[in-house]
Amino acid sequence: MAHYFGGKSFYLPAGDKIKEALRDAQIYQEFNGKNVPDLIKKYRLSESTIYAILRNQRTLQRKRHQMDFNFS
């Protein structure tokens, strides 16, 4: 790594943050509009946490879509 990044600083997120981001993306993909109770059980999260994740993921998707649209 020193060969590629020697003298430069960079941010490497903790493993927990990466796992959380992957989990959140998976929850968003599995969501079908009617399966919140199933997601609560599967991921052992509260209803409010599931809805917060869905809200955040929806916002991320919109931003990605807008970026794609702007570069086309």
UniProtKB/Swiss-Prot annotation:
* Gene3D superfamilies assigned: Homeodomain-like (1.10.10.60)
Q: Which UniProt keywords apply?
A: DNA-binding, Transcription, Transcription regulation
Cross-referenced Pfam families, in alphabetical order? Mor
Please give the Gene Ontology molecular function terms for this protein.
DNA binding
Q: Where are the transmembrane segments?
A: none
Residue spans binding DNA: 35-55
Determine the domain of life of the protein's source. Bacteria
Describe its function: Required for transcription of the phage late genes.
Family label:
Belongs to the c/mor transcriptional regulatory family.
- Name under which the protein is recorded: Mu-like prophage FluMu protein C
Q: What is the lineage of its organism?
A: Bacteria, Pseudomonadati, Pseudomonadota, Gammaproteobacteria, Pasteurellales
